[in-house]
Amino acid sequence: MTLFRSSLRLRLPVTLLSPPPIHKHSRLFSASHRLFTAAEMPVDTSQRLAKLRELMKERHVDVYLIPSEDSHQSEYIAPCDARRAFISGFTGSAGCAIVSMSKAALSTDGRYFNQAAKQLDENWLLLKRGMENVPTWQEWTAEQAEGGKVVGVDPSLITAAEARKLSDTIKNTGGSLVGVPDNLVDLVWGGDRPARPREKVMVHPIEFAGQSFEEKITDLRKELTKKKRAGMVISMLDEIAWLYNLRGADIPFNPVFFAYAIVTHSTAELFVDEAKLTQAVKEHLGDKVALRPYESIFESLKLLSQAAASNGDEGHQKFLLSDKASWSLNLALGGEEKVEEVRSPIADAKAVKNAVELEGTRACHIRDGAALTEYFAWLENELINKKTVLNEVDASDKLAQIRSKHKDFVGLSFDTISSTGPNAAIIHYRAERGNCPNIDPNAVYLCDSGAQYLDGTTDTTRTLHFGKPTEMEKKAYTLVLKGLISIDTAVFPKGTTGYAIDAFARQHLWRNGLDYLHGTGHGVGSYLNVHEGPMGIGTRVQYAETPITAGNVLSDEPGYYEDGNFGIRIENIVVAKEVKTPHKFGDKPWIGFEHVTMTPLCQNLMDTSLLTAEEKKWVNDYHTEVWEKTKGFFNNDELTRNWLKRETQPI
């Protein structure tokens, strides 16, 4: 079997990296399609690991890496790409599996420590990322490579930058990194591997997009001219969907489709399975975008690189490639000599919503807030007044049904987190149908949910208690609420990053020796991925490099979690905007936030003695706004209207 070493100057064997055949796949865009759940017992991975090690031995690989991402570096993936989950049994969205001939380790972050501990069997070591004296997965891999061992990875599943950094780390212990074009986990999976999805691609109308795809391509070409580059190769699925004003359903909850794109100064191409395109899509693209087979991307890159080499202008021989694009794409274009790795200008443009997208975001959050209000009123009535026994999935199914009644609803934006009591402490918990607890009205109930509407994407978390909360539960909730308010009311000079304001949300917890192991905020797409970059609020390096800009849409979601006891999280979506200030130091614009989430907070969990007068006013003003913007949905629904009226009374 052909291997290629970690030098990025080597060419990729195109024939070896063609994607697997595309087969018909059922639509996966709703809560009824739960592939994995946090409540599952560990899977026995012994046979899977044994088969993988046999393949490693055949290919002279001593250590094999299984990242979470697909060949487009997607955070959320199609079932056919859930390789790390298959080999390890751990189903969280983030992590990396490392398998040597005698050991196996799984590294993940604080969101998933509890889940991973439950799902990994005795074959696996859990590496808790960021914890003291715990090696990173790169360091652990390098340790296993000591003495000249070979580390292998599918080059389509990591970026070129990751490959370079990892190669250097491994070399320090005497090992080496190679790319293994045929994915070994796919070979272990065999015929049981889910088929590749072939869902239809649809046009995203200008009434929701706010800008034509022709205008977006023109803007991108201006960037190419500015940087003196021949073109840009695009592999991130949400960037392709946004650029061409198209949407799909190939990945659960994310309205994207498998494709690549190339834009030069004179051409625009879309590499996609043409059978997925409706006639409306073909008419939409017209003669402005050339259609190519999805599988032909690597051969096209080789030809493109050769054509650029004949250009006399040395600067125009290089192509822009996102720093998130795969190592295999980088090599196919010619490596460092032909590629400039950049933060994608498309990602930056997409993150700054236009006026139409912002109006859509506001409108869909009002409708979504009404849906959540109806749901919480129903849930309290069932649990308290009717004494109905409901489990976590029963409840989330009802929420999905309520949401589906609203205008322009398409589906959910992620699998609803419906968690009672100690399950609320599992940050990314998933209730298992047929094997989840009943909701305890005398315990905390945390609901993190969202939806896809044609005019926007929503993501809201509310923590409620229908009985008598403990003093610690009330204290924790109120400290988290203070953090949410601190972000909501923050004002800062243009150029400030989300890294810089993350402590605003944590300060109240920190004063009490408390904290949470996740970011405070992420970007949100416009009828696109619920997690969107490049900006965010947290301690990631990327967040320190990306200023928050007017037009960004972000979550504001501090939390607190006690393992085995309870969890608290409150989440609103906010829009960054320029604000007026009494003064203007440095003659800079100043940035603040506008909240768009319209769902009542839980007064039963508030310890108002911990709130300042300003914070109480914020809560009262917020609840007045929620009441005014959503009460009209309940003119014929006395139960919900009365619940909304009660929950929005002044504190």
From Swiss-Prot:
One of the Pfam families matching this protein, by short name: Peptidase_M24
Question: What Gene Ontology terms for biological process does this UniProt record contain?
Answer: proteolysis
Query: What is the required cofactor set for this protein?
Result: Mn(2+)
Q: Which GO terms describe its cellular component?
A: cytoplasm
Q: Which reaction does it catalyse?
A: Release of any N-terminal amino acid, including proline, that is linked to proline, even from a dipeptide or tripeptide
| CDD domains, per database record | APP (cd01085)
List of residues binding Mn(2+) 2: 448, 459, 571
The protein's name is Probable Xaa-Pro aminopeptidase P
Q: Which organism is it from?
A: Coccidioides posadasii (strain C735)
